[in-house]
Protein backbone atom coordinates (compact mmCIF):
# COMPACT_ATOMS: atom_id res chain seq x y z
CA UNK A 1 0.00 0.00 0.00
CA UNK A 2 2.77 2.42 0.93
CA UNK A 3 4.47 1.61 -2.35
CA UNK A 4 1.36 2.59 -4.30
CA UNK A 5 1.07 5.85 -2.38
CA UNK A 6 4.75 6.55 -3.05
CA UNK A 7 4.35 6.08 -6.80
CA UNK A 8 1.16 8.12 -6.80
CA UNK A 9 2.94 11.04 -5.13
CA UNK A 10 5.75 10.84 -7.68
CA UNK A 11 3.15 10.91 -10.45
CA UNK A 12 1.51 14.01 -8.97
CA UNK A 13 4.90 15.72 -8.68
CA UNK A 14 5.72 15.03 -12.33
CA UNK A 15 2.31 16.31 -13.46
CA UNK A 16 2.71 19.46 -11.36
CA UNK A 17 6.15 20.16 -12.82
CA UNK A 18 4.88 19.58 -16.33
CA UNK A 19 1.97 21.95 -15.78
CA UNK A 20 4.34 24.58 -14.43
CA UNK A 21 6.61 24.24 -17.46
CA UNK A 22 3.63 24.44 -19.81
CA UNK A 23 2.50 27.65 -18.12
CA UNK A 24 5.89 29.18 -18.67
CA UNK A 25 6.02 28.13 -22.31
CA UNK A 26 2.67 29.80 -22.94
CA UNK A 27 4.08 33.25 -22.14
CA UNK A 28 4.38 35.12 -25.43
CA UNK A 29 7.50 36.99 -26.42
CA UNK A 30 7.28 40.34 -28.19
CA UNK A 31 10.51 41.88 -29.46
CA UNK A 32 11.44 45.38 -30.56
CA UNK A 33 14.32 46.46 -32.76
CA UNK A 34 14.99 50.12 -33.47
CA UNK A 35 17.34 51.92 -35.80
CA UNK A 36 19.64 53.97 -33.59
CA UNK A 37 19.15 54.53 -29.87
CA UNK A 38 16.13 54.18 -27.60
CA UNK A 39 16.74 57.51 -25.86
CA UNK A 40 15.97 59.63 -28.92
CA UNK A 41 13.14 61.43 -27.07
CA UNK A 42 10.90 60.58 -30.02
CA UNK A 43 9.93 57.63 -32.18
CA UNK A 44 12.13 54.95 -30.62
CA UNK A 45 11.43 56.03 -27.07
CA UNK A 46 7.66 55.91 -27.73
CA UNK A 47 7.91 52.35 -29.03
CA UNK A 48 9.89 51.26 -25.98
CA UNK A 49 7.24 52.74 -23.67
CA UNK A 50 4.57 50.75 -25.50
CA UNK A 51 6.31 47.40 -25.25
CA UNK A 52 7.19 47.90 -21.58
CA UNK A 53 3.59 48.75 -20.77
CA UNK A 54 2.54 45.55 -22.54
CA UNK A 55 4.91 43.58 -20.33
CA UNK A 56 3.51 45.17 -17.18
CA UNK A 57 -0.14 44.77 -18.17
CA UNK A 58 -0.11 41.37 -19.90
CA UNK A 59 2.79 39.56 -18.24
CA UNK A 60 4.60 38.82 -21.49
CA UNK A 61 8.29 38.48 -22.24
CA UNK A 62 9.93 41.33 -24.13
CA UNK A 63 13.27 41.76 -25.85
CA UNK A 64 14.54 45.21 -26.87
CA UNK A 65 17.43 45.80 -29.25
CA UNK A 66 18.98 49.04 -30.52
CA UNK A 67 20.70 48.35 -33.83
CA UNK A 68 22.48 49.91 -36.80
CA UNK A 69 22.70 49.07 -40.50
CA UNK A 70 25.47 46.48 -40.48
CA UNK A 71 23.95 44.67 -37.50
CA UNK A 72 20.30 44.44 -38.58
CA UNK A 73 20.43 40.88 -39.91
CA UNK A 74 22.31 39.39 -36.96
CA UNK A 75 20.24 41.25 -34.39
CA UNK A 76 16.94 40.17 -35.94
CA UNK A 77 18.19 36.59 -36.15
CA UNK A 78 18.91 36.71 -32.41
CA UNK A 79 15.37 37.94 -31.75
CA UNK A 80 14.01 35.08 -33.84
CA UNK A 81 16.18 32.59 -31.95
CA UNK A 82 14.83 34.07 -28.72
CA UNK A 83 11.42 32.55 -29.52
CA UNK A 84 9.83 35.86 -30.50
CA UNK A 85 6.20 35.52 -31.52
CA UNK A 86 6.05 39.08 -32.85
CA UNK A 87 8.96 41.32 -33.81
CA UNK A 88 8.41 45.06 -34.16
CA UNK A 89 10.80 47.14 -36.27
CA UNK A 90 10.92 50.92 -35.95
CA UNK A 91 11.97 53.11 -38.87
CA UNK A 92 12.06 52.96 -42.65
CA UNK A 93 15.68 51.77 -42.71
CA UNK A 94 14.50 48.37 -41.47
CA UNK A 95 12.09 47.95 -44.40
CA UNK A 96 14.20 45.65 -46.59
CA UNK A 97 15.55 43.37 -43.89
CA UNK A 98 12.14 42.81 -42.26
CA UNK A 99 10.61 42.07 -45.65
CA UNK A 100 13.36 39.52 -46.26
CA UNK A 101 13.02 37.85 -42.87
CA UNK A 102 9.22 37.71 -43.07
CA UNK A 103 9.45 36.09 -46.50
CA UNK A 104 11.95 33.48 -45.31
CA UNK A 105 10.60 32.82 -41.81
CA UNK A 106 6.83 32.36 -41.92
CA UNK A 107 6.67 30.96 -38.38
CA UNK A 108 7.30 34.42 -36.89
CA UNK A 109 5.11 37.52 -37.22
CA UNK A 110 6.62 40.92 -37.93
CA UNK A 111 5.37 44.51 -37.85
CA UNK A 112 7.11 47.72 -38.83
CA UNK A 113 6.47 51.39 -38.22
CA UNK A 114 7.06 53.47 -41.36
CA UNK A 115 8.14 50.68 -43.68
CA UNK A 116 8.50 51.67 -47.34
CA UNK A 117 7.00 49.11 -49.73
CA UNK A 118 5.96 50.80 -52.95
CA UNK A 119 3.78 48.52 -55.09
CA UNK A 120 5.21 45.38 -53.46
CA UNK A 121 3.06 42.59 -52.06
CA UNK A 122 3.90 42.34 -48.38
CA UNK A 123 4.18 38.85 -46.82
CA UNK A 124 1.12 37.76 -44.82
CA UNK A 125 3.17 37.67 -41.63
CA UNK A 126 4.30 41.30 -41.97
CA UNK A 127 2.19 44.35 -41.10
CA UNK A 128 3.34 47.82 -42.12
CA UNK A 129 2.13 50.93 -40.31
CA UNK A 130 2.57 54.10 -42.36
CA UNK A 131 1.69 57.57 -41.13
CA UNK A 132 0.64 60.35 -43.47
CA UNK A 133 3.33 62.47 -41.87
CA UNK A 134 2.81 65.27 -44.35
CA UNK A 135 -0.55 66.09 -42.74
CA UNK A 136 0.77 66.94 -39.29
CA UNK A 137 3.85 68.54 -40.88
CA UNK A 138 1.48 70.80 -42.84
CA UNK A 139 -0.04 71.97 -39.56
CA UNK A 140 3.44 72.50 -38.14
CA UNK A 141 4.41 74.59 -41.16
CA UNK A 142 1.21 76.60 -41.00
CA UNK A 143 1.78 77.28 -37.30
CA UNK A 144 5.44 78.21 -37.77
CA UNK A 145 4.65 80.55 -40.63
CA UNK A 146 1.99 82.36 -38.62
CA UNK A 147 4.15 82.51 -35.48
CA UNK A 148 7.42 83.60 -37.10
CA UNK A 149 8.55 87.16 -36.44
CA UNK A 150 11.47 87.11 -38.88
CA UNK A 151 9.60 85.64 -41.86
CA UNK A 152 12.17 82.84 -42.03
CA UNK A 153 11.67 79.32 -40.67
CA UNK A 154 13.67 76.10 -40.89
CA UNK A 155 13.45 72.33 -41.25
CA UNK A 156 16.18 69.91 -40.16
CA UNK A 157 15.82 66.31 -41.30
CA UNK A 158 17.86 63.21 -40.51
CA UNK A 159 18.41 60.79 -43.40
CA UNK A 160 16.68 61.79 -46.60
CA UNK A 161 14.06 59.31 -47.80
CA UNK A 162 10.37 58.96 -48.55
CA UNK A 163 9.23 59.40 -44.95
CA UNK A 164 11.40 62.44 -44.23
CA UNK A 165 10.48 64.03 -47.55
CA UNK A 166 6.80 63.80 -46.63
CA UNK A 167 7.66 65.74 -43.47
CA UNK A 168 9.65 68.36 -45.36
CA UNK A 169 7.23 68.96 -48.22
CA UNK A 170 4.21 68.93 -45.92
CA UNK A 171 5.92 71.48 -43.68
CA UNK A 172 6.91 73.74 -46.55
CA UNK A 173 3.42 73.52 -48.07
CA UNK A 174 1.74 74.44 -44.79
CA UNK A 175 4.09 77.39 -44.38
CA UNK A 176 3.36 78.67 -47.88
CA UNK A 177 -0.37 78.14 -47.37
CA UNK A 178 -0.23 80.43 -44.33
CA UNK A 179 2.05 83.02 -45.93
CA UNK A 180 3.19 82.82 -49.54
CA UNK A 181 6.12 85.13 -48.76
CA UNK A 182 7.58 83.02 -45.95
CA UNK A 183 11.11 81.76 -46.50
CA UNK A 184 11.72 78.12 -45.57
CA UNK A 185 15.27 76.80 -45.16
CA UNK A 186 15.42 73.00 -45.27
CA UNK A 187 18.51 70.90 -44.59
CA UNK A 188 19.31 67.21 -43.99
CA UNK A 189 22.14 66.28 -41.65
CA UNK A 190 22.44 62.74 -43.08
CA UNK A 191 22.11 60.92 -39.75
CA UNK A 192 19.67 60.35 -36.91
CA UNK A 193 22.41 59.92 -34.35
CA UNK A 194 24.68 62.99 -34.29
CA UNK A 195 23.69 65.37 -31.50
CA UNK A 196 26.57 67.76 -32.23
CA UNK A 197 25.80 68.04 -35.93
CA UNK A 198 22.15 68.77 -35.24
CA UNK A 199 23.17 71.42 -32.75
CA UNK A 200 25.62 73.18 -35.08
CA UNK A 201 23.20 73.03 -38.03
CA UNK A 202 20.48 74.69 -35.98
CA UNK A 203 22.86 77.30 -34.58
CA UNK A 204 23.81 78.34 -38.10
CA UNK A 205 20.16 78.56 -39.14
CA UNK A 206 19.29 80.74 -36.16
CA UNK A 207 22.23 83.03 -36.87
CA UNK A 208 20.98 83.40 -40.45
CA UNK A 209 17.65 84.76 -39.24
CA UNK A 210 15.53 81.63 -38.79
CA UNK A 211 13.47 81.87 -35.61
CA UNK A 212 11.51 78.58 -35.67
CA UNK A 213 12.90 75.15 -36.63
CA UNK A 214 11.01 71.91 -37.16
CA UNK A 215 13.43 69.05 -36.48
CA UNK A 216 12.71 65.48 -37.60
CA UNK A 217 16.11 63.93 -37.00
CA UNK A 218 16.09 61.62 -33.98
CA UNK A 219 19.05 62.23 -31.66
CA UNK A 220 20.37 64.81 -34.14
CA UNK A 221 17.09 66.64 -33.58
CA UNK A 222 17.75 66.75 -29.85
CA UNK A 223 20.86 68.71 -30.75
CA UNK A 224 18.63 71.18 -32.59
CA UNK A 225 16.57 71.64 -29.44
CA UNK A 226 19.73 72.14 -27.40
CA UNK A 227 20.84 74.93 -29.75
CA UNK A 228 17.56 76.76 -29.19
CA UNK A 229 17.94 76.42 -25.40
CA UNK A 230 21.48 77.77 -25.51
CA UNK A 231 20.55 80.76 -27.66
CA UNK A 232 17.61 81.59 -25.40
CA UNK A 233 14.51 83.71 -26.06
CA UNK A 234 13.13 84.07 -29.61
CA UNK A 235 14.71 80.79 -30.77
CA UNK A 236 11.92 78.30 -31.15
CA UNK A 237 11.36 74.65 -31.95
CA UNK A 238 8.55 72.48 -33.25
CA UNK A 239 8.91 69.07 -31.64
CA UNK A 240 8.38 65.77 -33.42
CA UNK A 241 6.95 62.27 -32.83
CA UNK A 242 6.00 62.92 -29.19
CA UNK A 243 5.39 66.00 -27.06
CA UNK A 244 8.92 67.35 -26.64
CA UNK A 245 8.03 70.51 -24.73
CA UNK A 246 9.52 69.05 -21.53
CA UNK A 247 12.96 69.14 -23.18
CA UNK A 248 12.86 72.92 -23.58
CA UNK A 249 9.73 74.42 -21.97
CA UNK A 250 10.58 77.94 -23.16
CA UNK A 251 11.51 76.99 -26.72
CA UNK A 252 9.34 74.11 -27.96
CA UNK A 253 6.08 75.81 -28.95
CA UNK A 254 4.19 72.85 -30.39
CA UNK A 255 4.97 69.24 -31.26
CA UNK A 256 3.90 67.26 -34.32
CA UNK A 257 3.17 63.90 -32.71
CA UNK A 258 2.73 60.39 -34.06
CA UNK A 259 0.78 58.23 -31.64
CA UNK A 260 3.16 55.31 -31.95
CA UNK A 261 2.91 54.12 -28.35
CA UNK A 262 -0.88 53.78 -28.21
CA UNK A 263 -1.02 52.24 -31.69
CA UNK A 264 1.65 49.64 -30.95
CA UNK A 265 0.00 48.80 -27.66
CA UNK A 266 -3.47 48.24 -29.11
CA UNK A 267 -2.30 46.26 -32.15
CA UNK A 268 0.00 44.03 -30.11
CA UNK A 269 -2.64 43.44 -27.44
CA UNK A 270 -5.13 42.40 -30.11
CA UNK A 271 -2.58 40.03 -31.65
CA UNK A 272 -1.78 38.45 -28.27
CA UNK A 273 -5.47 37.95 -27.51
CA UNK A 274 -6.47 36.54 -30.90
CA UNK A 275 -3.24 35.00 -32.17
CA UNK A 276 -3.91 36.66 -35.51
CA UNK A 277 -1.82 39.40 -37.14
CA UNK A 278 -3.70 41.33 -39.81
CA UNK A 279 -0.63 41.36 -42.02
CA UNK A 280 0.11 41.38 -45.71
CA UNK A 281 -0.77 45.05 -46.03
CA UNK A 282 0.05 48.64 -45.14
CA UNK A 283 -2.17 50.42 -42.64
CA UNK A 284 -2.24 54.17 -43.37
CA UNK A 285 -2.92 56.57 -40.51
CA UNK A 286 -3.38 60.31 -40.59
CA UNK A 287 -5.26 63.08 -38.80
CA UNK A 288 -8.64 61.52 -39.61
CA UNK A 289 -7.67 58.20 -38.02
CA UNK A 290 -6.30 60.02 -34.94
CA UNK A 291 -2.83 58.71 -35.65
CA UNK A 292 -1.31 62.19 -35.70
CA UNK A 293 -1.77 65.41 -33.80
CA UNK A 294 -0.41 68.87 -33.04
CA UNK A 295 0.20 69.44 -29.31
CA UNK A 296 0.60 72.92 -27.83
CA UNK A 297 3.10 73.58 -25.04
CA UNK A 298 0.95 74.60 -22.05
CA UNK A 299 3.69 76.94 -20.82
CA UNK A 300 3.36 79.04 -23.97
CA UNK A 301 -0.40 78.70 -24.38
CA UNK A 302 -1.19 82.36 -23.66
CA UNK A 303 1.04 83.52 -26.51
CA UNK A 304 0.09 81.00 -29.18
CA UNK A 305 -3.41 79.66 -28.48
CA UNK A 306 -4.98 81.72 -31.28
CA UNK A 307 -2.53 80.45 -33.90
CA UNK A 308 -2.88 76.94 -32.51
CA UNK A 309 -6.67 77.01 -32.84
CA UNK A 310 -6.36 78.25 -36.42
CA UNK A 311 -3.99 75.38 -37.13
CA UNK A 312 -6.53 72.88 -35.77
CA UNK A 313 -9.15 74.32 -38.13
CA UNK A 314 -6.75 73.74 -41.00
CA UNK A 315 -6.51 70.18 -39.75
CA UNK A 316 -10.27 69.83 -40.14
CA UNK A 317 -9.97 70.96 -43.76
CA UNK A 318 -7.36 68.26 -44.32
CA UNK A 319 -9.56 65.60 -42.75
CA UNK A 320 -12.53 66.72 -44.86
CA UNK A 321 -10.49 66.52 -48.04
CA UNK A 322 -10.66 70.25 -48.74
CA UNK A 323 -6.87 70.58 -48.53
CA UNK A 324 -4.83 67.94 -50.35
CA UNK A 325 -1.44 67.89 -48.65
CA UNK A 326 1.63 67.23 -50.84
CA UNK A 327 4.06 64.49 -49.81
CA UNK A 328 6.83 64.65 -52.45
CA UNK A 329 8.40 67.13 -54.89
CA UNK A 330 5.90 66.54 -57.70
CA UNK A 331 2.83 66.97 -55.50
CA UNK A 332 4.46 69.94 -53.75
CA UNK A 333 5.18 71.74 -57.03
CA UNK A 334 1.59 71.16 -58.11
CA UNK A 335 0.33 72.45 -54.76
CA UNK A 336 2.33 75.68 -55.07
CA UNK A 337 1.23 76.10 -58.69
CA UNK A 338 -2.43 75.79 -57.72
CA UNK A 339 -1.99 78.38 -54.96
CA UNK A 340 -0.49 80.81 -57.46
CA UNK A 341 -3.41 80.32 -59.87
Curated annotation (Swiss-Prot):
Pfam families: Bmp (PF02608). It is a lipid-anchor. GO terms for cellular component: plasma membrane. Keywords: Cell inner membrane, Cell membrane, Lipoprotein, Membrane, Palmitate, Signal, Transport. A lipid is attached at residue 17 (N-palmitoyl cysteine). InterPro entries: BMP_lipoprotein, Peripla_BP_I, PnrA-like. It is found in: Cell inner membrane. PROSITE patterns: PROKAR_LIPOPROTEIN. Residues 1-16 form the signal peptide. It comes from the Bacteria. A lipid is attached at residue 17 (S-diacylglycerol cysteine). The keyword Iron-sulfur does not apply. Coiled coil: none annotated. Adenosine binds at residues 35, 114, 192, 218, 241, 258. The keyword Transport applies. Monomer. Belongs to the BMP lipoprotein family. Human sera from 3 Lyme borreliosis patients are positive for this antigen, as were mice injected with this protein. However, BmpD immunization does not confer protection against B.burgdorferi infection in female C3H/HeN mice. Binds adenosine and inosine but not guanosine, xanthosine or ribose. May be part of an ABC-type nucleoside uptake system involved in the purine salvage pathway. Other probable members of the ABC transporter system are substrate binding proteins BmpB, BmpA and BmpC (BB_0382, BB_0383 and BB_0384 respectively), ATP transporter RbsA and 2 permeases (BB_0677, BB_0678 and BB_0679 respectively). This is Basic membrane protein D.
Amino acid sequence: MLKKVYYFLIFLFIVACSSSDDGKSEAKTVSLIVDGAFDDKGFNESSSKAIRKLKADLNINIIEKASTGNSYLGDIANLEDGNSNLIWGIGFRLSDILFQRASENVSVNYAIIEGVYDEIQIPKNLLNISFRSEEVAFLAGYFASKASKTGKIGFVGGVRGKVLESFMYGYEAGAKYANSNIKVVSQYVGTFGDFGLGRSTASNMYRDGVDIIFAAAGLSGIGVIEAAKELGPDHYIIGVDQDQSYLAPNNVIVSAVKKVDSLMYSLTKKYLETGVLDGGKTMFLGLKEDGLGLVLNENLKSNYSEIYNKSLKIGQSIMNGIIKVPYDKVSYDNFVLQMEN
